[in-house]
A protein has these predicted regions:
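Glycine-rich phosphate-binding loops of nucleotide-dependent enzymes
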Residues: 1-217
Length: 217
């Protein structure tokens, strides 16, 4: 119910945004038809609508979670053809899903592992062994950078509040140094104080030059 101008008061509206990072042309899937838009560096593009309006379906088709039936996607001017969400991650397009419990956190893992798992490709050697020192470092950086309230990284993530669980998911994907960050209902089910933190966080991402897609009902 808040005015978006108040929510994103931290954004400098006089600042010129950068080049087009993500471009979608006539994208179609079994769940949508002919979606087209651009997202520039330092820009927050919002998708709003009722459930079933296609706001989540658009990004699912972009990241390879749903099959495409038509259209094209470009990342920095080059074709982006993601068959799976992993393809999107490798190319610098990451998504924080709407359903935190089913699609976001990994309940049986610790806070630290939930953060570092997004960077598993970078911290695993050719023999499949994980660099545990680097893994811990990523967890500590995520905890500090996103103000995750937990006594230690070994604590099960399910014991954290909803807001801190969500911060851990954001930390996971931001540790991969993405170019495009997709946030699907990022403040759903978290308290008012945490919501304010998230809005400020999104403003900071944009100021740093990240291309952001924000989905909200």
């Amino acid at each position: 119910g808040r005015d978006l101008g108040d929510v994103f008061s931290g954004l400098d509206r006089n600042k010129t945004v950068g080049d087009v990072v993500l471009e979608v042309k006539n994208l179609s899937s079994p769940f949508l038809k002919d979606a087209s838009f651009q997202v520039r560096a330092g820009e927050v593009v919002g998708f709003s609508g009722l459930v079933g309006a296609g706001r989540t379906e658009v990004v699912r088709a972009i990241i390879g979670a749903d099959p495409r039936t038509g259209g094209k996607v470009f990342l920095n001017g080059k074709p982006l053809n993601c068959r799976t969400p992993h393809d999107a991650i490798v190319n610098g397009v990451v998504m924080v899903p709407e359903d935190r419990k089913l699609q976001g956190i990994i309940p049986r893992m610790s806070v630290g592992r939930n953060i570092s798992i997004g960077s598993l490709d970078q911290i695993t050697n050719r023999l499949g062994f994980v660099n545990t020192r680097r893994e811990e470092q990523i967890g500590l950086e995520g905890k500090a950078n996103f103000n995750i309230k937990t006594p230690d990284l070994e604590k099960p993530i399910v014991e954290l509040s909803g807001g801190n669980q969500q911060k851990a998911i954001v930390a996971r994907w931001m540790s991969t140094k993405p170019e495009v960050l997709i946030l699907d209902e990022p403040t759903k089910g978290i308290d008012v104080g945490a919501k304010s933190e998230f809005y400020n966080m999104i403003c900071e991402f944009a100021k740093e030059g990240l291309a952001v897609i924000l989905i909200s009902s």
